[in-house]
Curated annotation (Swiss-Prot):
High-level lineage: Bacteria, Bacillati, Bacillota, Bacilli, Lactobacillales
Similarity-based family: Belongs to the UPRTase family.
Enzyme Commission number(s): 2.4.2.9
Cofactor note: Binds 1 Mg(2+) ion per subunit. The magnesium is bound as Mg-PRPP.
GO BP terms: UMP salvage; uracil salvage
TM regions (residue ranges): none
Function: Catalyzes the conversion of uracil and 5-phospho-alpha-D-ribose 1-diphosphate (PRPP) to UMP and diphosphate.
This protein's name: Uracil phosphoribosyltransferase
Length: 209
């Protein structure tokens, strides 16, 4: 079974509580998603490799550490995943950004893929798939399927809120993909929404339905 990490930092949990509220404005929702993604990034990026580098301070020459230049890619699942990109890019600005577009069929609750735009060397990159919600797991599974078909193998999934059903589905389909989430909620309701959740993240991010 794949690994899941729930990031319980007090700042993340505080901001997530505001994010969930019905009366949080579109502007505030957008800003909070960006901030939470950035804060989660410290844990998500914890295992990036380092290398020695010789530098000169105002006092002396010294050997210090820097990122080893591993190629990274942030891949949002459209459309809601877009809201998490800038927060992570603020930490790793050299990362490439791909896009996987999906929408959910409201009758079957199954994802339908309509766009895949990825860096040409995606198979050589460490990939962070981002989507605010991990509900049924269908979109996450399809996104990882698309990446693996193109040779990708080092993939992590980053979300703000997850449901046990979605976590289980993604772990069973792709046990090699580590999941990072700010909250593991109670369950899905009959419409496939996370309870207590935060509603439709895409609608709330962009102010459209």
């Amino acid at each position: 079974m794949g690994k899941i990490e729930v990031i319980n930092h007090p700042l993340i949990q505080h901001k997530l509580s505001i994010l969930r509220r019905t009366d949080t404005s579109t502007k505030a929702f957008r800003e909070l998603v960006d901030e939470i993604a950035m804060l989660m990034g410290y844990e998500v990026l914890r295992d990036l490799p380092l290398e020695d580098v010789e530098i000169e301070t105002p006092i002396t020459k010294t050997v210090q550490k820097q990122l080893a230049g591993k190629k990274l890619a942030i891949v949002p699942i459209l459309r809601a995943g877009i809201g998490m990109v800038d927060g992570l890019l603020s930490l790793v600005p050299a990362a490439k950004v791909g896009h996987i577009g999906m929408y959910r069929d409201e009758e079957t609750l199954q994802p339908v893929e309509y766009l895949v735009k990825l860096p040409e060397d995606i198979d050589q990159r460490q990939i962070f798939v981002v989507d605010p919600m991990l509900a049924t797991g269908g979109s996450a599974i399809l996104a990882v399927d698309s990446l693996k078909k193109r040779g990708a193998s080092n993939i992590k999934f980053v979300c703000l809120v997850s449901a046990p059903e979605g976590v289980k589905a993604l772990q069973e389909a792709h046990p090699d993909v580590e999941i990072f989430t700010a909250a593991l909620d109670e369950r899905l309701n009959e419409h496939g929404y996370i309870v207590p959740g935060l509603g439709d993240a895409g609608d709330r991010l962009f102010g459209t339905k």
